[in-house]
Swiss-Prot record:
PANTHER family: UPF0102 PROTEIN YRAN. SUPFAM superfamilies: Restriction endonuclease-like. It comes from Burkholderia pseudomallei (strain K96243). Pfam families: UPF0102. InterPro entries: Restrct_endonuc-II-like (IPR011335), tRNA_endonuc-like_dom_sf (IPR011856), UPF0102_YraN-like (IPR003509). This is UPF0102 protein BPSL3274. It comes from the Bacteria.
Length: 144
């Protein structure tokens, strides 16, 4: 599987949002998730990444966003949102099982597209009115 290039950690950027992050117009959990994925996509595009795919589903897993860095690196993005960090926050909610599912889906996508590019796994977390971008949040060998 692909391995990440050296990357510096991203920094959180405050973003205008309701105090608890959750858009009022979205009624369903799926609608809320889609709204956060759109916000994450726009943020990453402003940071210079290009959208490759959204909601890539393969047997055993799903990837919220697949982006591409200017240097060609594929970036598999998990978008997480929590109203508060009482139970560990958005980023902490990605356990070993979820990482394994992300890795399986990413590997299938990566192989289907030729497997030539470097890649990494990022998390965009929405917590307490802030968007936090965790670049290179985990690696393929961290899954278990």
């Amino acid at each position: 599987m692909c391995h990440a290039r050296e990357a510096s950690p991203g920094t959180g950027e405050p973003e205008a949002a309701p105090r608890d992050n959750f858009p009022r117009e979205a009624g369903s959990k799926r609608g809320i998730g889609a709204a956060f994925e759109t916000r994450a996509q726009r943020f990453l595009e402003r940071a210079g990444l290009a959208l490759v795919a959204r909601n890539v589903t393969v047997r055993g897993g799903e990837i919220d966003l697949v982006m591409r860095e200017r240097d060609g690196t594929l970036v598999f993005v998990e978008v997480r949102a929590r109203a508060n960090s009482r139970y560990g926050g958005a980023a902490a909610s990605i356990g070993a099982r979820k990482r394994m599912r992300l890795l399986l889906a990413a590997h299938a996508f990566w192989a289907r597209t030729g497997g030539a590019n470097a890649c990494r796994f990022d998390v965009v977390a929405f917590e307490g009115g802030r968007l936090v971008w965790l670049r290179d949040a985990f690696r393929a060998d961290d899954a278990g």
